[in-house]
Every structure is written in structure tokens, then in C-alpha cells.
């Protein structure tokens, strides 16, 4: 049944304004604060020079947009895997999991998402479960939208085991500009679908490896919303 608006719903003034701001302007991930602070410091130091001041303010705004951390509402249906990041689905194919995970070397479904510099670059848990492996592998910094990036570029792999025993692998891949992978997970962590677990700075890619028999729900060229778009349903 619909609820009648209360007095609190209709209030105006500073409290209402701040509530609107909080629901409209996404917060910033803590990893972005040093970059925003440095940009504002540049603007303050060059306040007598409009070009320097302007460059500092533009850089601060760009960093705030890049490191934005928008709230997301993941689906509650059991057995679904959500996109671990915002971006463009660039590949849907079968591929072997990263070798450093020491998993069986047989192809499984893989969905790749390319993140441009205009996407939110926080990464989100694709499915609830327990982290059973976290492996970082150094590599190159080629363009993340190329197929070879999955094999050649620096990457960080996280294996999540669900309550049913299925394993889903989320792989953060550095790109041409992205040179810093941040992952807050360790083996043994209990994780919840849609929660933030890391980021990659300035353009990157996310590969999601799925169990055999998984029903893929997306196609190349589709845009994904991290934490909300359903990539697949587990068998």
C-alpha cells in the first residue's frame, strides 16, 4: 500500500537541500582524495594566475568524477552474477583462468568489461561468498580494450566460492594509462554481492570467469552497471 508523505518528506531548508545533494552527487572513493587535494593545492598556490588556478580546479573536478563511488542496489535473486564494474562489455568468450591461480587449464565462460576514463573505476563483488584466493601478477601496460590484455597486462585475480561451491573469478587488469591496481581483499574474507573491493586508476578492464554451464545474460557492445547489471546465472 502506498504511504502518505509525512511532514519530514516535505520539509525544506538546509536539511532538505543537503539530502538532495547526497542522493544526487556520488561520494568519492578514499583513494581519490590525495589526487583531489593535490589539484586543489595547485589551484590555491596559483590563485593569482588564472591559468594555473583554472587548471587546478579542472583537475580537481576531473579526479572527483573519476574516483566517484556511486551507491548501487544489487539484485537479491540467488545464483546471479553481477558486473564487477561499470563499462562496455567488449568480449564474451571461453578462456582458461589465469595460470597463477593453479586451476584446471580448461576453457570456461569469460565476460570482459572495458572501463574508459569516463567510467566509475571502483570494482564490486560479483557474487556473495568467501574469498579463497587472491593473486597479483606483474605484467605489461598495453591498451586494456585489446584481447591480449587478459594475458599480457598486469592483473590481480580474486576467486570467490559461493555457498553452493561454485567458483567465480574477478580479474582486475591494468591498462595503458592505469598503472595502479588496488584490491582490499584477502583470503578468507566473507564478501557480499555489490560491495566495493578495489579500483584501478585511469582506464582498465575487468574479466569475470564463470563456471561451465553458466547462462550468460549479456552481449558484446552492451553497457554494464557495476553491482547491478546481471552478467550471468549460475547453473
Curated annotation (Swiss-Prot):
PTM comment text: Is synthesized initially as an inactive proenzyme. Formation of the active enzyme involves a self-maturation process in which the active site pyruvoyl group is generated from an internal serine residue via an autocatalytic post-translational modification. Two non-identical subunits are generated from the proenzyme in this reaction, and the pyruvate is formed at the N-terminus of the alpha chain, which is derived from the carboxyl end of the proenzyme.
Cofactors demanded by this protein: pyruvate
Pathway annotation: Phospholipid metabolism; phosphatidylethanolamine biosynthesis; phosphatidylethanolamine from CDP-diacylglycerol: step 2/2
Membrane topology summary: Peripheral membrane protein
EC number: 4.1.1.65
Gene name of the encoded protein: psd
Gene Ontology MF terms: phosphatidylserine decarboxylase activity
Subcellular location: Cell membrane
Keyword list, A-Z: Cell membrane, Decarboxylase, Lipid biosynthesis, Lipid metabolism, Lyase, Membrane, Phospholipid biosynthesis, Phospholipid metabolism, Pyruvate, Zymogen
Cofactor: binding details: Binds 1 pyruvoyl group covalently per subunit.
Protein name, as recorded: Phosphatidylserine decarboxylase proenzyme
Amino acid at each position: 500500500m502506498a504511504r502518505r508523505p509525512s511532514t519530514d518528506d516535505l520539509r525544506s531548508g538546509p536539511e532538505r537541500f543537503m539530502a538532495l545533494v547526497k542522493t544526487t552527487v556520488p561520494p568519492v572513493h578514499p583513494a581519490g582524495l590525495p589526487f583531489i587535494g593535490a589539484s586543489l593545492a595547485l589551484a590555491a598556490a596559483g590563485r593569482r594566475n588564472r591559468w594555473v588556478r583554472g587548471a587546478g580546479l579542472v583537475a580537481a573536478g576531473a579526479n572527483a568524477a573519476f574516483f566517484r563511488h556511486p551507491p548501487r542496489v544489487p539484485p537479491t535473486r540467488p545464483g546471479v552474477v553481477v558486473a564487477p564494474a561499470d563499462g562496455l562489455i567488449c568480449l564474451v568468450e571461453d578462456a582458461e583462468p589465469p595460470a597463477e591461480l593453479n586451476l584446471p587449464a580448461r576453457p570456461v565462460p569469460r565476460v570482459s568489461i572495458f572501463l574508459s576514463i569516463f567510467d566509475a573505476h571502483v570494482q564490486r563483488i560479483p557474487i556473495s561468498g568467501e574469498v579463497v584466493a587472491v593473486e597479483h601478477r606483474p605484467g605489461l601496460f598495453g591498451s586494456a580494450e585489446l584481447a591480449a590484455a587478459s594475458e599480457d597486462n598486469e592483473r590481480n585475480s580474486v576467486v570467490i566460492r559461493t555457498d553452493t561451491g561454485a567458483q567465480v573469478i574477478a580479474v582486475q587488469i591494468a591498462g595503458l594509462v592505469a598503472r595502479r591496481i588496488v584490491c582490499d581483499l584477502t583470503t578468507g574474507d566473507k564478501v557480499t554481492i555489490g560491495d566495493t573491493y578495489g579500483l584501478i586508476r585511469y582506464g582498465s578492464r575487468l574479466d569475470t570467469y564463470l563456471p561451465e554451464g553458466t547462462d550468460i545474460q549479456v552481449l558484446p557492445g552492451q553497457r554494464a552497471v557495476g553491482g547491478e547489471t546481471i552478467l550471468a546465472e549460475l547453473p
